[in-house]
């Protein structure tokens, strides 16, 4: 019978089978039903159960040869404080399979064996143990004087569990602080798996087995703070020297973390003979330690293969404790004749912030021709990286920097990177034409025989005036050397190095007498920052020959992230806001008559511009929202007067990295005089603003911040000729109007207070324009509604723009960031509706302005109380 059919059939079997047995007076009591079928024994839980002693009936059936299925039926099973002194009290199954499944919560807590060499609380051999389809599983603070603090079995399959699985603080006097097995499968679990603070006196702080397959788990795996003699978290070794044993496979898991594990001897996180790590999500080995192999130790004659298929593989701050060298950084230790088969970075990087150490091979493998090469392959934009960038200056000793590989290295494709003073030693290294070797200045590559390089890249950002790339080899061939400049490194922003001419900058050091590679090309690709020319030559000393570079500085081109014209263009934002304010105030001269009124209105304005230079840095948008309030009067003769004040809160941003917050304080006055033939109106407005600039750099480390002040005034004077129709159409009257508008704004210069600090000069903007248009209106006495529509063509008569230079304070370099010169022609449309409600009058005002490189919208909602 299949295990997944057992749960469905157990109740029927109870009724129909003559061999059905009910146990009522033991630890299970009425919580479970045990049935014996021809080929299996089934224990089905009928309710939650808590035990401090195993059911005698359950123990009796466990000792039979038939497979035993313990089915939770989505109930809970808690076992705690169980301390058996004899095998009769222990859950011991010596033949047949055992399956514990379908529990909502399965817990074994504070259970222990009290006699020496006694097995685990759950001990199973000569069969398979299944823990599957459970929700939460917890094995906490269990102990065994034998092997397997919580579980001991020949074959364990921990599969298809779906909430959380936790092995914590279990311990063993021998092997496997939590689990001891010959074969172990942790596969296809939806639940996250955590092994934390488990310990074993011998091997495998959390797990000890001969074969481990960990694959297809869709939530993270955590191995943290476990400890043992060998294999702080996992020990998977060949104790019987059988070639098919001692294999560990981590594959297709979502995320895996080994952190804080320790071993007194070998393998801070893992000690195994054969290991394959492939096609996982992110895998991290962090802060693990051992005498040999801070993170991973490979047994003599074994092998290790790492394929970063779904995320990066990281080794960081792992350490080993040599008696003669103290504590040094170490990621991987390969014992005698153990091989590092491949490093493949496909969809993630392989990052070694700790070195690799490989023992010297035995004499029969001492010739490079007999050794299997280490194959390095990476996809585009991925790399195998050796780096010491996370070490302090004091920690950068040779023992913490050097990776010793005893196999030939074949760089078959992609990119191998040596960074920040690391040293790579190997018998030989060969490079395929499509592969790239990247070496920072200060790094070293040493081979005892042939070194054949097709392309060597030296990153410009690593250059200083003292160190060089060092290569030591009896025979050397380099076809091409070039200097690489990553757009993210900003090498050409280096003030100390590039602001003046430099002589004899060391790049590459070779043993004397080796043939010189061709000189790098001095015509580098276009870039921002300091501009200049490179020249290269070889210099010879007593024992070395050095490739040196000479730099001749010419000019400076600022990075686009520094060039934003948003500060100067803020005056355009102020201009647009004041146009919106004037539009709102003009509505007080329209509508029904009243002796005196007080009013308030919400004001909003949206302004978009794409400049006229074609640069994305000149595109910007501005949004403002605020309020106006005032007093006004509007006579029957259409004379009007208004005083207003208000505040606007604005947000501006370009299409790159710069934004500005604005707080504006506004005061305005408006008047209108009307006769039967003509209406004359005038308006003046004053604006004082405080601006705060924020630059969230993508290419520089610090955020920029600055603040400045601006003042602006605007005004208009206009005349309109009203023409009254018969009132039967859509509008009752229309008028032809013309205005003369003026705006003048000035903002102070300022310096940014942090980040890539810049100084901005004063700027000013003056504009005189002539709107000409036609307006339509309709008054409805029945509904007390008033409608007004206006359309106008605007021609700018005179414009004066003054914007000073921007200065980068760290090098005093200046450049222009001119204010946008938008089109001098514009179209403006406005629609207003007012409705009288006894003493209250509501207002809706919408306007739209279209200019050659910009457009704006405004919307006002207000009310007037009429006395």
Curated annotation (Swiss-Prot):
The protein's name: Probable outer membrane protein PmpI
Lineage summary: Bacteria, Pseudomonadati, Chlamydiota, Chlamydiia, Chlamydiales
Keywords: Cell outer membrane, Cell wall, Membrane, Secreted, Signal, Transmembrane, Transmembrane beta strand
InterPro entries in the record: Autotransporte_beta, Autotransporte_beta_dom_sf, Polymorphic_membr_middle, POMP_repeat
Keyword Ion transport: no
Main location per the UniProt record: secreted
Entry membrane topology: Peripheral membrane protein
Keyword 4Fe-4S: no
Residues in the signal sequence: 1-29
Recorded GO CC terms: cell outer membrane; extracellular region
Domain Autotransporter: 591-867
Pfam family, one: Chlam_PMP
Domain of life: Bacteria
Protein family (similarity comment): Belongs to the PMP outer membrane protein family.
Places the protein is found: Secreted, Cell wall; Cell outer membrane
